[in-house]
C-alpha cells in the first residue's frame, strides 16, 4: 500500500473500527480510507446464521446488481454448433465446445463464468476437478446450465453475480468499485442483502444477519449496523 499523506492519515484516524456504522456511512468511510492507484473493488462479507453443513441451510443463488460490479466478466459458452451464433451475438467472449474442453484440461482457466447447456453437462462434468475449486462449474441453480444461452450471457454482462455461503456461513461478494457513487454502492449492497433475506432457509433459527462488513481490496473492514432494516 502506498504511504499515506497527512490528510489521508487524518481521515483513517477518524474511523472507529470497533464501531458499527449505517450502510451509507460504512460505504463512505471505505471510499475515504482506500488509497490505491487502481480502482479497487468494494466487497461485502455477510455472516449468516446458518449451518452450511446441513443441506437445507446451504444458501446459494444469483442476484442482478442494479449497477453491476464494474468488472467486465469474461464468459465462456460451451454449446452445440447451432447455439454458437446466439452466444456470440449476446456478448460471450469465448464460444465453442471440444476445443475449449481440451484447453481447460490443459490448464486454461482465463475466464470468470462458464455457461453451458443441459445436454453438454456430461462432457463438462469431467472438468469438475479443475472448475469446481475455482467456482467455475456451471450449475442449473445459478442459471449457468440453460437452453436460453443469450439470456444467460446478457444477465451476467448486466451485473448478475453468484453468491454462496462458505463453510463458516459467510457470503462474500463485490458490490462495485471505489469509483462508484455512494448511492450506486448502496443500491447494490441493498439488493444483495434483500436477496439473502428472501433466501433464508426455513430451518435457520435465531439471528439470520449476524454481521456485515465492508472493505475495499486494500482497506480495513468497516462493520455495518445490522439492527437497521436497510429500507426494506
UniProtKB/Swiss-Prot annotation:
GO terms for molecular function: rRNA binding; structural constituent of ribosome; tRNA binding. Belongs to the universal ribosomal protein uL1 family. PANTHER family: 54S RIBOSOMAL PROTEIN L1, MITOCHONDRIAL, LARGE RIBOSOMAL SUBUNIT PROTEIN UL1M. This is Large ribosomal subunit protein uL1. Part of the 50S ribosomal subunit. InterPro entries: Ribosom_uL1_bac-type, Ribosomal_uL1, Ribosomal_uL1-like, Ribosomal_uL1/biogenesis, Ribosomal_uL1_3-a/b-sand, Ribosomal_uL1_CS. Binds directly to 23S rRNA. The L1 stalk is quite mobile in the ribosome, and is involved in E site tRNA release. Protein L1 is also a translational repressor protein, it controls the translation of the L11 operon by binding to its mRNA. It comes from Amoebophilus asiaticus (strain 5a2). Keywords: Repressor, Ribonucleoprotein, Ribosomal protein, RNA-binding, rRNA-binding, Translation regulation, tRNA-binding. Pfam families: Ribosomal_L1. GO terms for biological process: regulation of translation; translation. One of its GO terms (cellular component) is large ribosomal subunit.
Amino acid at each position: 500500500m502506498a504511504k499515506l499523506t497527512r490528510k489521508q492519515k487524518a481521515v483513517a484516524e477518524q474511523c472507529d473500527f470497533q464501531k458499527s456504522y449505517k450502510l451509507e456511512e460504512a460505504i463512505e468511510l471505505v471510499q475515504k480510507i482506500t488509497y490505491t492507484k487502481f480502482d479497487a473493488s468494494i466487497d461485502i462479507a455477510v455472516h449468516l446464521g446458518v449451518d452450511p453443513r446441513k443441506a437445507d441451510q446451504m444458501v446459494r443463488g444469483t442476484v442482478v446488481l442494479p449497477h453491476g460490479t464494474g468488472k467486465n466478466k469474461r464468459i465462456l459458452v460451451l454449446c452445440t454448433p447451432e447455439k454458437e451464433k446466439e452466444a456470440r451475438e449476446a456478448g460471450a467472449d469465448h464460444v465453442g465446445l471440444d476445443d475449449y474442453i481440451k484447453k481447460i484440461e490443459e490448464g486454461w482457466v482465463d475466464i470468470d463464468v462458464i455457461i453451458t447447456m443441459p445436454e453438454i453437462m456430461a462432457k463438462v462434468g469431467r472438468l469438475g476437478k479443475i472448475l469446481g475449486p475455482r467456482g467455475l462449474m456451471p450449475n442449473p441453480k445459478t442459471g449457468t446450465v440453460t437452453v436460453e444461452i443469450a439470456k444467460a450471457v446478457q444477465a451476467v454482462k448486466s451485473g448478475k453475480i453468484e453468491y454462496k455461503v462458505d463453510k463458516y456461513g459467510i457470503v462474500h461478494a463485490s458490490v462495485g468499485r471505489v469509483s462508484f457513487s455512494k448511492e450506486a454502492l448502496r443500491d447494490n449492497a441493498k439488493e444483495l442483502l434483500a436477496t439473502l433475506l428472501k433466501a433464508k432457509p426455513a430451518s435457520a433459527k435465531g439471528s439470520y444477519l449476524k454481521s456485515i462488513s465492508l472493505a475495499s481490496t486494500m482497506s480495513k473492514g468497516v462493520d455495518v449496523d445490522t439492527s437497521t432494516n436497510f429500507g426494506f
